């Protein structure tokens, strides 16, 4: 623990507290009020005021520390979670992308043109093969180079001009020695230059013998830039680091250059970088479909001066109970603050009651000042408590929005690969022959590497299925879908056709996407390749990866017409127009209420990936939605009595609230106000149904009377009891809140007949300016019929 400006913070929070301006603002306001309380306590003691302020002052002091520490911890948690979301999304998106690369290298290494070229070892063949590599790279734009080498390391051909000698890089030997598997390295190689490159290699075989090594060089810098630009919203620094903490690539080479070792200590929350303190977090990549990734992590940093800035979403009204998302500690803080304020209200109220029979102007003024200071203290605590809850709510909103963004980004990236796959496989010479047996073997090999497909089909120029990778029962079937005709009309090898998301007979009647590309021979379509996406498990996996930890959360993909493509559970809310009208790349987050329950909702409309859905003519908008349940919808408004001006020569009236109804009794009829927490509740019917229990007072069992039903406020909170006397019987009147004790002008009660049971309890009306208050009769309250 460490102390900062008189407040003791946990060690991991204390160094950062000075940068949390709202914490400092609340601390200064409460410190100023603390000095005022000290002065008022001294004056109360010197004036023999019957108001012991010590307990209330001590409680305020204790809660001040707890409130500020809690606020600081939650602000740090929010900032850390925001950075954590950015870091986790970055590394997980990269891992999913690289998973596709492991499939690419495995399939391309079996490409007939590549295998035949390696076996021929003919420069003329290699020159022609280079054009095929360019066609591949035009579809799979994630690669910056493709290199084909002989078993002895000689570069046979490559996508871009560069090293053309004999490679001695270890990756060649590793690929040759790893039969049937890929080699993944991030290191400098002689065929890629002095800088490290993320490279995937696979041995090229013919008849079981190695005839070459194929290497795909991933364009990591461009991919990282796209990921970081999408995630960094302010001045965050994002970097991928290797297992030793060395920077691989970052979005700010000046602050985190490649090769720089980020020295993170376990549990460290901050890091000095370039003379500036940064909040820092690190997240490691999670395996995807068995692929562990390259073993990297994302480090995310934000200057502390910006990390704790006001978030626009922090202004959301917390009108939900939050028992499943707020800790009990958070829920207790505003409750304790209100309880302390009520004890202060009782103290001041009782002080005014005790002064009613006296003419001590100083004591009355002192009590009024104590009450005013209490109200100012209450305002500060309410603002701080509200900020505490909205800070946590902002974290939920940010989490929902981030995860919705992740889900739809992963979807677009995944389907980008599907558009690439169909276009590339349509260039296969084997499939162009329309030989069913040869095609079936090729399609089965493809589907074994690319497991995201339920089936891969070859169809002819009439739309008849020639071969299938898995479900061969569709062979010979005539396909009449619109996407088939669209595909066969295409004459550009870079174009493709796609179905809308709809039920398909090729997918057991369930909804899915089908991507298709034409097989062109001499400029004419002789058929096409169709990929039936295995949407049910694939979409579910994407959504579950974006599912918050909060129990009952739901993630979904929707269309703009509200139709649900996939979901992890029933959507508990109706999506509003603000969600369904989102345009590409737009996000929304907010709180929705349905059926008396509240939900934090985040949504993002997909914006495509690279050329997919951005410049390739494909338009299929999808919105990612994440819903987090937040408990019952509640109204946090607490009714308070208005300020009442004293009327010269008036009668002192003690006012109070039952529910939201402002009522009063003559101050002279009130002995005092007491707590009712320890009351014994009983129920009686008939005439005595107002008599609801007892509370111990002055060593006696004080009957309690409840008139809430009489004022149409049944069920209102009952936090105080006014000790009154009816004849010779003491009793306690249950009330919700205390109002002012003020001098008011009394008038006779008139014209109130027929307005409910409350009229039977009213003796007079009290007036101050435009405020009229019914003044109740103690005798009628205790002994009158209940209706």
Model-derived features with residue positions:
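Short hydrophobic beta-strand segments that form the core of ligand-binding sensory/regulatory domains
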Residues: 199, 211-217, 295-301, 514, ...
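Extracytoplasmic/periplasmic sensory segments of membrane signal-transduction proteins
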Residues: 26, 31-179, 350, 354-492
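Solvent-exposed, extracytoplasmic
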Residues: 126-140, 213-267, 304-330, 437-450, ...
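Extracytoplasmic/periplasmic ligand-binding sensor regions of membrane-associated signaling proteins
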Residues: 127-226, 267-281, 432, 447-455, ...
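Extracellular/periplasmic juxtamembrane segments that couple receptor/chemosensory ectodomains to their
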Residues: 2-74, 260-395, 575-644
């Amino acid at each position: 623990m460490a102390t900062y400006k008189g407040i003791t913070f946990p060690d991991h929070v204390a160094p950062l507290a000075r940068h949390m301006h709202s914490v400092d603002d609340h601390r200064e306001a409460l410190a100023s009020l603390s000095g005022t309380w000290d002065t008022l306590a001294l004056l109360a003691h010197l004036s023999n005021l019957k108001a012991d302020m010590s307990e209330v002052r001590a409680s305020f002091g204790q809660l001040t520390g707890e409130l500020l520490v809690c606020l600081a911890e939650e602000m740090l948690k929010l900032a850390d979670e925001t950075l954590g979301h950015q870091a986790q999304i970055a590394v997980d998106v990269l891992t999913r992308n690289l998973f596709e690369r492991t499939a690419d290298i495995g399939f391309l290494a079996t490409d007939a043109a590549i295998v035949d070229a390696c076996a021929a070892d003919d420069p003329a063949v290699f020159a022609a093969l280079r054009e095929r590599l360019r066609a591949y790279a035009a579809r799979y734009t994630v690669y910056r180079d493709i290199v084909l080498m002989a078993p002895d390391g000689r570069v046979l051909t490559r996508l871009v001009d560069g090293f053309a000698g004999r490679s001695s890089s270890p990756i060649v030997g590793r690929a040759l020695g790893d039969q049937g598997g890929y080699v993944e390295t991030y290191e400098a190689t002689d065929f890629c230059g002095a800088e490290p490159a993320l490279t995937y290699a696979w041995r090229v075989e013919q008849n079981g013998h190695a005839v070459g090594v194929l290497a795909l060089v991933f364009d990591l810098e461009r991919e990282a830039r796209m990921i970081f630009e999408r995630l960094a919203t302010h001045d965050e620094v994002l970097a991928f680091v290797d297992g030793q903490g060395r920077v691989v690539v970052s979005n700010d080479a000046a602050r985190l250059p490649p090769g720089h070792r980020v020295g993170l200590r376990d549990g460290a929350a901050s890091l000095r970088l370039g003379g500036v303190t940064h909040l820092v977090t690190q997240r490691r990549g999670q395996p995807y479909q068995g692929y562990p990734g390259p073993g990297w992590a994302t480090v995310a940093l934000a200057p502390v001066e910006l990390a704790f800035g006001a978030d626009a979403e922090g202004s959301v009204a917390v009108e939900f109970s939050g028992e499943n998302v707020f800790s009990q500690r958070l829920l207790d803080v505003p409750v304790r603050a209100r309880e302390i304020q009520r004890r202060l209200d009782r103290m001041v109220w009782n002080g005014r009651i005790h002064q009613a029979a006296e003419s001590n102007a100083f004591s009355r003024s002192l009590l009024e000042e104590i009450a005013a200071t209490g109200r100012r203290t209450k305002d500060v605590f309410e603002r701080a408590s509200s900020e505490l809850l909205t800070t946590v709510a902002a974290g939920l909103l940010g989490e929902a929005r981030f995860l919705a963004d992740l889900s739809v980004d992963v979807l677009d990236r995944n389907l980008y690969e599907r558009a690439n796959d169909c276009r590339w496989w349509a260039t296969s010479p084997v499939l162009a022959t329309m030989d069913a047996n040869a095609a079936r073997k090729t399609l089965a090999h493809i589907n074994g590497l690319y497991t995201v497909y339920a089936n891969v089909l070859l169809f002819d120029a009439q739309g008849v299925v020639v071969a299938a990778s898995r479900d061969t029962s569709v062979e010979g079937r005539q396909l009449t879908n619109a996407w088939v005709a669209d595909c066969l009309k295409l004459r550009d090898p870079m174009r493709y056709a796609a179905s809308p998301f709809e039920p398909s007979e090729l997918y057991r009647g369930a909804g899915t996407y089908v991507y298709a590309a034409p097989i062109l021979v001499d400029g004419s379509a002789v058929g096409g390749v169709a990929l039936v996406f295995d949407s049910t498990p694939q979409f579910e996996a994407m959504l579950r990866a974006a599912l918050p930890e909060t129990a009952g959360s739901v993630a979904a993909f929707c269309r703009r017409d509200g139709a649900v493509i996939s979901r992890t559970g029933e959507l508990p809310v109706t999506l509003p127009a603000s969600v369904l009208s989102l345009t590409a790349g737009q996000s929304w987050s907010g709180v929705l209420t349905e059926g008396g329950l509240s939900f934090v909702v985040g949504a993002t409309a997909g914006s495509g990936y690279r050329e997919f859905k951005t410049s390739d003519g494909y338009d299929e908008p999808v919105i990612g939605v994440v819903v987090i349940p937040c408990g019952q919808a509640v109204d946090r408004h607490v009714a308070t009595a208005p300020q009442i001006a004293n009327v010269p020569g008036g009668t002192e009236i003690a006012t109070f609230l039952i529910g939201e109804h402002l009522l009063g009794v003559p101050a002279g009829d009130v002995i005092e106000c007491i707590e009712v927490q320890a009351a014994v509740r009983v129920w009686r019917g008939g005439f005595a149904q107002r008599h609801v229990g007892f509370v111990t007072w002055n060593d006696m069992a004080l009957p309690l009377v409840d008139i809430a039903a009489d004022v149409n406020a049944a069920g209102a909170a009952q936090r105080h009891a006014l000790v009154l006397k009816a004849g010779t019987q003491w009793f306690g009147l249950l009330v919700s809140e205390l109002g002012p004790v003020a001098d008011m002008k009394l008038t006779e009660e008139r014209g109130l007949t027929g307005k409910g049971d409350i009229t039977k309890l009213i003796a007079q009306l009290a007036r101050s300016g435009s405020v009229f208050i019914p003044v109740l009769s103690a005798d009628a309250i205790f002994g009158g019929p209940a209706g």
